[in-house]
């Protein structure tokens, strides 16, 4: 049976309690409505949006009609739209909640039901506990036969949501300078293509070339094995286009456009930046813009990254006098890291560049920010040079993940137990110590183990190990960092990359671990 958690619902579109279907969505919405009414939100605005996946229109209709029958003021977005538009509308209209029908970058068979709440101190953010457990209990108490529905049409607010979101993006970047830039872009068969192209054009970037085979929304995602820009092969068409048109920047959105991946020309080849590289570049760009702004900001600006993300942004932020904070994984925690929050990211390609308007990851505004950043480096070596400058300033940081699929959950538990009780004494010749995050007494307590160490020459190692919360996987997140002394940035980067491969290869993998590369 599908259970309601902080991510709402997500699963295959299928009949019965184990699948996403109209009955499941109807019950979930009735439970959410009852919970909102019990908290004093009867008759309040609630935003409902959807992507273009199989079942999304039917599920959105069920959601808005159940809410309308319960007396809520439903803001029903009229067309398939990116998830950030729903998050934005929830916040800007002071809604009690927002519901987005999407499964983001999951396989074509899946769909989902994501919930934002309007409660302070973080209105428009994804819900956190105990709200998920309370809503789950309300859903369990609901019988499908008792749930009425009432048709509801999009009103002026709903019809204006797209234009309002675009206007906000223009306002967010009104002080940035756009220089001529050629961009290659793909929405990976999702709903972000038209909106991204229009947002870029309105901010001064009209030279945009799109991957035609992937531009129109298609719930079957026919050109990719997985519609996730992290996956091998997903951005092959994008990078080929970027090379063909001699682009300055490549951008890939995931299907609901809440994630943004950036590709750059690095020497004689194109490559996708890692989420950590993009996060460090965008985060420092935001901080530098804040420092140059004439608007007083009072307290030190806050940037946030998750415990599995790299530490390059952390180092750069501290050098700039900012407050750099770490949170548990997930934007429900990142956007609650502290105030005044100016930027948040996690290594899985999620970026929040406008937390005043969207308290979640937002691929559209991240793409616009990347365009402004890239245009500022035209004639100076591009984003490859920008990244090199960041490494020269803060030390070279190299990150890489390793994921293992282990169908036996007991094997994952055994590996985690071994890391806690008998961790390796060294990895690739670097002595390490282990810290068990399950024993922490602060807000970072979780099922994870961190291995850290340092060589006499200043090379620092960090590996975070944790089981996946949604799949039978064990995940390692590795990082090596080192100051740039005698060697060049590229030389140090190459040496650390090779060493990190050795580190990850020495980590426990279990007897039947299937390597998952991304």
Region roles according to the model:
Residues 243, 247-249, 253, 269, ...:
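Phosphate-binding and adjacent anionic-ligand microenvironments
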Residues 116, 121-148, 278-301, 305-315, ...:
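Glycine-rich phosphate-binding loop plus the immediately following alpha-helix
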Residues 2-3, 12, 111-242:
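Gly/Ser/Thr-enriched, mixed-charge loops and adjacent short helices
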Residues 47-110, 201-262:
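N-terminal small/polar loop signature for handling phosphorylated ligands or for N-terminal nucleophile
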Residues 58-67, 109-118, 196, 258-278, ...:
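Short Gly/Thr/Asp-enriched flexible loops that form oxyanion-binding sites at enzyme active sites
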Residues 2-18, 103-106, 187-199, 345-350, ...:
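Conserved phosphate/anionic-ligand binding catalytic regions in large, soluble enzymes, centered on
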Residues 1-70, 156-181, 191, 464, ...:
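An N-terminal, well-structured beta->alpha segment
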């Amino acid at each position: 049976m599908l259970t309601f958690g902080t991510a709402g619902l997500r699963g295959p579109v299928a009949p019965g309690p184990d699948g996403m279907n109209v009955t499941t969505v109807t019950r979930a919405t009735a439970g959410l409505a009852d919970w909102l009414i019990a908290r004093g939100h009867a008759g309040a605005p609630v935003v409902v949006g959807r992507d273009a996946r199989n079942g999304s229109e039917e599920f959105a209709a069920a959601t808005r009609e159940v809410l309308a029958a319960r007396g809520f003021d439903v803001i029903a977005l009229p067309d398939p739209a990116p998830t950030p538009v729903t998050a934005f509308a929830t916040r800007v209209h002071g809604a009690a909640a927002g519901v987005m029908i999407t499964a983001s970058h999951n396989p074509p068979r899946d769909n989902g039901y994501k919930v934002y709440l309007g409660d302070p101190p973080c209105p428009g953010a994804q819900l956190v506990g105990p709200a998920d457990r309370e809503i789950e209990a309300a859903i369990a108490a609901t019988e499908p036969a008792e749930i009425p529905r009432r048709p509801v049409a999009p009103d002026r607010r709903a019809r204006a949501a797209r234009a309002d979101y675009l206007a906000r993006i223009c306002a967010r970047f009104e002080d940035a300078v756009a220089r001529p830039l050629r961009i290659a872009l793909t929405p990976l068969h999702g709903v972000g293509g038209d909106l991204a192209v229009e947002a870029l054009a309105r901010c001064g970037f009209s030279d945009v070339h799109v991957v035609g085979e992937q531009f129109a929304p298609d719930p079957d995602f026919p050109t990719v094995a997985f519609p996730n820009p992290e996956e091998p092969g997903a951005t092959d068409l994008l990078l080929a286009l970027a090379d063909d048109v001699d682009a300055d920047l490549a951008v890939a959105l995931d299907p609901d456009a809440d994630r943004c991946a950036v590709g750059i020309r690095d020497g004689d080849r194109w490559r996708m930046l890692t989420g950590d590289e993009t996060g460090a570049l965008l985060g420092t760009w935001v901080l530098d813009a804040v420092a140059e702004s004439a608007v007083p900001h009072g307290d030190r600006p806050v940037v946030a990254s998750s415990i599995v993300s790299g530490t390059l942004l952390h180092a750069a932020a501290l050098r700039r006098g900012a407050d750099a904070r770490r949170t548990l994984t997930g934007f429900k925690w990142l956007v609650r890291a502290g105030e005044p929050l100016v930027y948040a990211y996690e290594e899985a390609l999620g970026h929040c560049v406008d937390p005043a308007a969207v308290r979640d990851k937002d691929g559209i505004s991240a793409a616009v920010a990347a365009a402004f950043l890239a245009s500022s480096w035209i004639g100076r070596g591009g984003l490859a040079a920008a990244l090199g400058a960041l490494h020269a300033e803060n030390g070279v940081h190299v990150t890489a993940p390793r994921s293992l699929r282990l169908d036996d959950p007991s094997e994952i538990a055994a590996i985690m137990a071994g890391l806690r009780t008998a961790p390796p004494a060294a990895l690739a010749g670097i002595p390490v110590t282990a810290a068990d995050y399950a024993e922490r007494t602060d807000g970072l307590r979780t099922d994870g183990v961190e291995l850290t160490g340092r060589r006499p020459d200043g090379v620092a190692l960090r590996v975070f190990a944790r089981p996946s919360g949604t799949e039978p996987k064990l995940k390692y997140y590795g990082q090596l960092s080192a100051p740039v002394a005698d060697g060049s940035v590229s030389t140090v980067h190459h040496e650390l990359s090779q060493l990190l491969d050795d580190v990850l290869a020495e980590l426990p993998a279990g007897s039947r671990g299937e390597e998952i590369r991304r």
